[in-house]
């Protein structure tokens, strides 16, 4: 099929590669505009743009895809299908209706659960046992279109937002190619979503990562994993930002208040929470590198009985 591909982050790259490898003709790649990054504010390509250019595919980077001139530009490519994977802009009805096979989206959840942004991180934060990817024919709503195919993934006990991102990116790429084959063969079935079962997720912000030590240890540990590698869970120690990259749930003690560092060993640091405690495994003090707790304690003195900021 002749394809227009729309996507922006690393998550989208695997699907673009899979479509190319499957022998489809990618006529155009649409991605978000380049953004300045780093201290030097150097303009950086999106991961999808880098992939497209490596394959010699034309790239289009509109600020607003819904503008009339941009819609007419897309129309010139006479695509059979538009594939959308984490593009980052809402498509107008005129774009949705443009290709004969419609616009197909790969969404990183088992719809109708987790419509919206950041479904990968929220699956970890909420302690889900399973999640997955869904392909759907897009309509004017946000992740409300008719479903075509699903693939389920089990979360590992130590699953992080980053590791689940990689799993679902690979699974989504595979499912997209399978979905395209069903559409081309005329065997695709379109199942409406049950809106009564729908749940919605919100964007992940840096502020979400601030650890509330009054919450149960189980919830905090899931937050730590879900926000690894971005934006990370953090607290404050002696006025400095202190990131927690990994921790284990342990039994706590009613003798200590939440946030109290009640035990410091050679390689251990135990923190009381609202229910249970956490043994910190990998940490990072402001201005320092990530390191295991033992390495941190050898280079930084922490008083037993001191507190992280609540």
Curated annotation (Swiss-Prot):
Q: What is its EC number?
A: 2.1.2.9
Q: Report the superkingdom from the record.
A: Bacteria
Which keywords describe this protein according to UniProt? Protein biosynthesis, Transferase
Q: Which reaction does it catalyse?
A: L-methionyl-tRNA(fMet) + (6R)-10-formyltetrahydrofolate = N-formyl-L-methionyl-tRNA(fMet) + (6S)-5,6,7,8-tetrahydrofolate + H(+)
Gene Ontology MF terms in the entry: methionyl-tRNA formyltransferase activity
Binding positions ((6S)-5,6,7,8-tetrahydrofolate): 109-112
- Which residues lie in coiled coils? none
Which GO cellular component terms, listed alphabetically, does the Swiss-Prot or TrEMBL entry include?
cytosol
What EC class is this? transferase
Summary of the function given for this chain in its UniProt record: Attaches a formyl group to the free amino group of methionyl-tRNA(fMet). The formyl group appears to play a dual role in the initiator identity of N-formylmethionyl-tRNA by promoting its recognition by IF2 and preventing the misappropriation of this tRNA by the elongation apparatus.
Hey, which family's this protein in? Belongs to the Fmt family.
What's this protein's name? Methionyl-tRNA formyltransferase
What is the species of this protein?
Agathobacter rectalis (strain ATCC 33656 / DSM 3377 / JCM 17463 / KCTC 5835 / VPI 0990) (Eubacterium rectale)
């Amino acid at each position: 099929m002749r394809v227009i591909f729309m996507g922006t982050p690393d998550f989208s790259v695997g699907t673009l590669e899979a479509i190319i490898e499957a022998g489809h003709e990618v006529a155009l790649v649409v991605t978000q505009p380049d953004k300045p990054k780093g201290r030097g504010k150097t303009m950086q390509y999106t991961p999808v743009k880098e992939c497209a250019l490596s394959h010699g595919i034309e790239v289009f980077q509109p600020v607003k895809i819904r503008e009339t001139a941009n819609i007419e530009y897309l129309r010139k490519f006479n695509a059979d299908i538009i594939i959308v994977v984490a593009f980052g802009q809402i498509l107008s009805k005129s774009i949705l209706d443009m290709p004969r096979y419609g616009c197909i989206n790969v969404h990183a959840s088992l719809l109708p659960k987790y419509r919206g942004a950041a479904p990968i991180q929220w699956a970890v934060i909420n302690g889900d046992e399973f999640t997955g990817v869904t392909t759907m024919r897009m309509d004017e709503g946000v992740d409300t279109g008719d479903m075509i195919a699903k693939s389920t993934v089990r979360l590992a006990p130590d699953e992080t937002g980053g590791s689940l991102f990689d799993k679902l990116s690979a699974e989504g790429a595979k499912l997209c190619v399978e979905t395209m084959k069903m559409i081309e063969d005329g065997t695709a079935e379109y199942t409406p979503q049950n809106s009564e079962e729908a749940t919605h997720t919100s964007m992940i912000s840096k502020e979400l990562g601030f650890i509330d030590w009054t919450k149960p240890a189980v919830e905090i540990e899931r937050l730590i994993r879900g926000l690894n590698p971005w934006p990370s869970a953090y607290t404050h120690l002696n006025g400095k930002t202190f990131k927690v990259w990994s921790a284990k749930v342990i039994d706590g003690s009613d003798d200590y208040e939440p946030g109290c560092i009640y035990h410091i060993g050679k390689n251990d640091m135990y923190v009381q929470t609202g229910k249970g405690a956490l043994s910190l495994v990998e940490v990072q003090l402001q201005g320092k590198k990530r390191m295991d707790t033992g390495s941190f304690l050898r280079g930084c003195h922490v008083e037993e009985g001191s507190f992280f900021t609540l």
